[in-house]
Amino acid sequence: MKQANKMVIYQVFPRWFGNMKSSLVKNGSKVENGVGKFSDFTPVALSKIKELGTTHIWYTGVIEHATNTDYTAYQIRRDHAAVVKGNAGSPYAIKDYYDIDPDLADNVPDRMKEFESLVRRTHEAGMKVIIDFVPNHVARQYYSDAKMAYVRSEEHTSELQSHLM
């Protein structure tokens, strides 16, 4: 018998969900190894997840983190390769707490709108959203390009970073 108020959480890395590339090139780029997108969570996909009895989806790795992918064309600072874990980076090496991982968007400038759309689709499918981060676990080159003007934020610097520049 199913309990009335039991939470069932479905944890997922959006970068893996919907990624149809079966290759696994060591230190490969997102072109070589693929990457899932927010848009892969279609209403049909979300309804299938809901059918599992899911009440909440825990989207892991959605906050912008350090990566070796070059997004300077979108005014996103480049990370030094020596301080990035692999090419994709660790989703817990937060680069900007106020922004979304550009890898997960179909259109990088619209990444926040795409994430908001994902949240809306999830709610429309009858589930709640969880995202996570580790406080103070930041990338060596933390810099917010998306924070509100009134938010004071110091760039994260370290002795290692000064040697890399």
Label each PLM-derived region with a short phrase.
Residues 1-128, 136-153:
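N-terminal structural segment of carbohydrate-active enzymes
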Residues 155-165:
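Single conserved hydrophobic/aromatic residue that forms the stacking wall/gate
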